[in-house]
């Protein structure tokens, strides 16, 4: 019995294409995961914080406080 009959022949063609296909799919999945984590972990809370701040923000009150503190030179 020869050793060639015991082991199957290794695949020699398409190794790079197969490896790239697997890794591209993995990279795409990881990229989607990171994008979703950023959106829901950073962007949405930041957007909500800005909305909450500007919902109750009174710019004239803030201006008057700064004017009385002497921040502006031209507004007395």
Curated annotation (Swiss-Prot):
Query: Where are residues bearing Phosphoserine located in the sequence?
Result: 74
Q: Which residues lie on this side of the membrane: Mitochondrial matrix?
A: 4-14
What pathway does this protein act in? Energy metabolism; oxidative phosphorylation
- Bilayer-crossing residues are 15-55
Q: Specify the protein's topology with respect to the membrane.
A: Single-pass membrane protein
**Disulfide feature:** none
Please, one GO biological process term?
oxidative phosphorylation
- Residue ranges, Mitochondrial intermembrane compartment? 56-76
Where is the signal peptide, in residue numbers? none
Q: Name one GO cellular component term.
A: mitochondrial inner membrane
What Pfam families does the annotation carry?
Answer: COX6C
Q: Where found? A: Mitochondrion inner membrane
Query: This protein's superkingdom?
Result: Eukaryota
- Family of this protein: Belongs to the cytochrome c oxidase subunit 6c family.
Q: What does this protein do?
A: Component of the cytochrome c oxidase, the last enzyme in the mitochondrial electron transport chain which drives oxidative phosphorylation. The respiratory chain contains 3 multisubunit complexes succinate dehydrogenase (complex II, CII), ubiquinol-cytochrome c oxidoreductase (cytochrome b-c1 complex, complex III, CIII) and cytochrome c oxidase (complex IV, CIV), that cooperate to transfer electrons derived from NADH and succinate to molecular oxygen, creating an electrochemical gradient over the inner membrane that drives transmembrane transport and the ATP synthase.
Assembly and interactions?
Component of the cytochrome c oxidase (complex IV, CIV), a multisubunit enzyme composed of 14 subunits. The complex is composed of a catalytic core of 3 subunits MT-CO1, MT-CO2 and MT-CO3, encoded in the mitochondrial DNA, and 11 supernumerary subunits COX4I, COX5A, COX5B, COX6A, COX6B, COX6C, COX7A, COX7B, COX7C, COX8 and NDUFA4, which are encoded in the nuclear genome.
Name of protein: Cytochrome c oxidase subunit 6C-2
Which organism is this entry from?
A: Rattus norvegicus (Rat)
Report the gene name: Cox6c2
């Amino acid at each position: 019995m020869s050793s060639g009959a015991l082991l199957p022949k290794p695949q020699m063609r398409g190794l790079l294409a197969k490896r790239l296909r697997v890794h591209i799919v993995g990279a795409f999945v990881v990229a989607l995961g990171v994008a979703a984590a950023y959106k829901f972990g950073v962007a949405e809370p930041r957007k909500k914080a800005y909305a909450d701040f500007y919902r109750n923000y009174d710019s004239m009150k803030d201006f008057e406080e700064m004017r009385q503190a002497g921040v502006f030179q031209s507004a007395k």
